[in-house]
């Protein structure tokens, strides 16, 4: 369904004043009739405050990628990692600026509709496909967390070794959780109160951050011994290779696993499909105000990511894994609470992520069709089976972070916003050789290079077996 203002019809106003109004106010080009109330974007006046919009966008940014950031720091060094993280944050903010500019000109409030405005129906299909792939990757990362953490939690409560009993195998448990919990929730016709789980997810990740900081000061250097384990148990999954026995932090380092670090960071900052819906709901919407929302949200997540990665790395140094929770003692009470909170959050988030995938598939494959329960159920079943098979076959969550962070993440952050800007902003307003369009072009080229280099190094690691030899 087209989401454009009929008065604008996706066309640029003839007068420059109208264009400036759209850039700054996200408003129709013509002012309201005398004595009437000003009409906000899309004839809808948002009621969400600035602070709540920041919270909503922070929820959209926050995800499972935070669990892999300490691993990324271990393979880049503290200073190099923080510099790369800052660059990704700044580039994400710039790409949101491009999206808001395009949306203001075209009068569109959906990422997919920008694709249609730029390239017609084919553009909408491409954008929807990229978003679906990214959400499938997010679902896979959530289910992988269940696969790796749920056996430890159940084994702790039952005083059993999670590696010894068949009913504690992660592959079996994710199938059980998918059938008994996720599938019934995914079959709901509307999200309802499931939409509030994003707030729960952010709360759980804040709890995770506080716990990581606390455990750093409690453990000191956790290399070679485990001060939190009960009855002198070893750290769960602590690798014996590559330990930094001196507990010295590396400021700059480069190794074969660095090909995963930037994709993990890119994966952690993707929020772009949710920017325009949040913009629509914003009270007193303007481009400048929404950009401020984005900057505050990205800045807050940068601080949270930086703290989590730094304290996680300074606890385990070069031995840290891509799924950092696996580094802590299985029986530590605080970490057990963190595991339970994270498991609850990711389990309830999976059906929330599944809803937009199903909606996009129905719009692409069955446009104009009335609601059908058999189709509704079939799409949910196929998606869950596909994701479960993917999670069972993939050896580490790092591979999920790496592949999605190297494909859909640069597409959503770098490539698509720059292409939209080049196609949607008319040459009468910004000539192709103007500095803003040259910047956008370079931004898109950077995204293509980032994708090619990351995928190239990852495939090389897989081909040479260095990924398995790393012990992660």
Swiss-Prot record:
Optimum pH is 8.0. It is found in: Cell membrane. Predominantly expressed in stomach, brain, liver, lung and intestinal tract. Glycans are attached at residue 226. InterPro entries: AA_transpt_TM (IPR013057). One of its GO terms (cellular component) is plasma membrane. It catalyses: L-serine(out) + Na(+)(out) + H(+)(in) = L-serine(in) + Na(+)(in) + H(+)(out); L-alanine(out) + Na(+)(out) + H(+)(in) = L-alanine(in) + Na(+)(in) + H(+)(out); glycine(out) + Na(+)(out) + H(+)(in) = glycine(in) + Na(+)(in) + H(+)(out); L-glutamine(out) + Na(+)(out) + H(+)(in) = L-glutamine(in) + Na(+)(in) + H(+)(out). One of its GO terms (molecular function) is L-glutamine, sodium:proton antiporter activity. GO terms for biological process: amino acid export across plasma membrane; amino acid import across plasma membrane; amino acid transport; asparagine transmembrane transport; glutamine transport; glycine transport; L-alanine transmembrane transport; L-glutamine import across plasma membrane. The modification N-acetylmethionine is found at residue 1. Its main location: membrane. Pfam families: Aa_trans. It is a multi-pass membrane protein. The chain crosses the membrane at residues 49-71, 88-108, 126-146, 167-187, 193-213, 258-278, 296-316, 335-355, 377-397, 400-420, 440-460. Residues 1-48, 109-125, 188-192, 279-295, 356-376, 421-439 are cytoplasmic. It comes from the Eukaryota. Disulfide bonds join 221-247. Residues 72-87, 147-166, 214-257, 317-334, 398-399, 461-472 are extracellular. Not inhibited by lithium. Partial allosteric regulation on ions sodium binding. The record marks 464 as: Involved in pH-sensing to the transport activity regulation. Keywords: Acetylation, Cell membrane, Disulfide bond, Glycoprotein, Membrane, Transmembrane, Transmembrane helix. Symporter that cotransports neutral amino acids and sodium ions, coupled to an H(+) antiporter activity. Releases L-glutamine and glycine from astroglial cells and may participate in the glutamate/GABA-L-glutamine cycle and the NMDA receptors activation. In addition, contributes significantly to L-glutamine uptake in retina, namely in ganglion and Mueller cells therefore, participates in the retinal glutamate-glutamine cycle. The transport activity is pH sensitive and Li(+) tolerant. Moreover functions in both direction and is associated with large uncoupled fluxes of protons. Belongs to the amino acid/polyamine transporter 2 family. This is Sodium-coupled neutral amino acid transporter 5. It comes from Homo sapiens (Human).
């Amino acid at each position: 369904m087209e989401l454009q203002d009929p008065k604008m019809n996706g066309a640029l106003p003839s007068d420059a004043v109208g264009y400036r109004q759209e850039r700054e106010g996200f408003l129709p080009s013509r002012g309201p009739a005398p004595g009437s109330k000003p009409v906000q974007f899309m004839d809808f006046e948002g009621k969400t405050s600035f602070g709540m919009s920041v919270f909503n966008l922070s929820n959209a940014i926050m995800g499972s990628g935070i669990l892999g950031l300490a691993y990324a720091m271990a393979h880049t060094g503290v200073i190099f990692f923080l510099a790369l993280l800052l660059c990704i944050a700044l580039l994400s903010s710039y790409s949101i600026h491009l999206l808001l500019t395009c949306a203001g000109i075209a009068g569109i409030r959906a990422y997919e509709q920008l694709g249609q405005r730029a390239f017609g129906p084919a553009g909408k299909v491409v954008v929807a496909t990229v978003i679906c792939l990214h959400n499938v990757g997010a679902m896979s990362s959530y289910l992988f967390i269940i696969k790796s953490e749920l056996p430890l939690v159940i084994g702790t409560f039952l005083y059993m070794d999670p590696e010894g009993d068949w009913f504690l195998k992660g592959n079996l448990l994710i199938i059980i959780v998918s059938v008994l919990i996720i599938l019934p929730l995914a079959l709901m016709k509307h999200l309802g109160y499931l939409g509030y789980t994003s707030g729960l997810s952010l709360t759980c990740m804040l709890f995770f951050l506080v716990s990581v900081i606390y455990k750093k000061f409690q453990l000191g250097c956790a290399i070679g011994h485990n001060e939190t384990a009960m009855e002198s148990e070893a750290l769960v999954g602590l690798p014996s290779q590559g330990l930094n026995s001196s507990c010295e932090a590396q400021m700059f380092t480069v190794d074969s696993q660095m090909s995963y670090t930037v994709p993990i960071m890119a994966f952690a900052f993707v929020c772009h499909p949710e920017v325009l819906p949040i913009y629509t709901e914003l009270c007193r919407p303007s481009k400048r105000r929404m950009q401020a929302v984005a900057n505050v949200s990205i800045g807050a997540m940068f601080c949270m990511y930086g703290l989590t990665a730094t304290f996680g790395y300074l606890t385990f140094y070069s031995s840290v894994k891509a799924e950092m929770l696996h580094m802590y003692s299985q029986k530590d009470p605080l970490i057990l609470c963190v595991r339970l909170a994270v498991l609850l959050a990711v389990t309830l988030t999976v059906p929330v992520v599944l809803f937009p995938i199903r909606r996009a598939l129905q719009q692409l494959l069955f446009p104009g069709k009335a609601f059908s329960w058999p189709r509704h159920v079939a799409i949910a079943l196929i998606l869950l089976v596909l994701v479960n098979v993917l999670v069972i076959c993939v050896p580490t969550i790092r591979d999920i972070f790496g592949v999605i962070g190297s494909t859909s993440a640069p597409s959503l952050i770098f490539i698509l916003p720059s292409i939209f800007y080049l196609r949607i902003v008319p040459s009468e307003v910004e000539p192709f050789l103007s500095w803003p369009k040259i910047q956008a072009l370079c931004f898109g080229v950077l995204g293509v290079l980032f994708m090619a280099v990351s995928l190239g190094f990852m495939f090389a690691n897989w081909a040479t077996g260095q990924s398995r030899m790393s012990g992660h």
